[in-house]
Amino acid sequence: LICVDSDGCAMDTMDIKHFRCFGPCMVHEWELEQWQEPILARWNEINLYSMTRGVNRFKGLAIALAEIDQQYKTIPGLSDLTGWVDQTKALSNSALEQAIRETGSECLQKALHWSQQVNVSINQLDESLKKPFDGASQGLAAAAEFADVAVVSSANRDAVLEEWGKYGLLDHV
């Protein structure tokens, strides 16, 4: 069995999604515009240019907001988010919705809204920006001759299926 991550491994989409969607949506949701430049630079460092590259969106959000809380602006209810990230069995919108029903936390509500807006923003990216790396299809085809190939991703399932389907990558898994 060969497991292949989607964003940043098969699909050349990781950078654009963080540059145009994840970080900017966080800045907007938490009204951080006055510190946008350093905050976005740090978001990209956490999610693209460090050992935490590819971390789940909610873990990346918790890391970034904890730093923002210390350096720029108090993030009300931050402990609700960090506690949920540390304790939940699933880092997903549906698990977050359940936690909101149980706690009513405003910070968790903002995190859910941010995540939903990220998905909307990703869906609005021009299709020319969501392509596989050169050679991805051929590499997957070669791997599939010798092993089962599976997609593993913390990215939105529907987006992964759409992106992989559009370029014929699903034919190899």
Task: Describe the function of each predicted region.
Residues 161-173:
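Extended hydrophobic/aromatic segments used for targeting, binding, or gating
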Residues 1-10:
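Short, hydrophobic/glycine-enriched beta-strand segments
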Residues 9-161:
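Alpha-helical substrate-recognition element adjacent to the catalytic core
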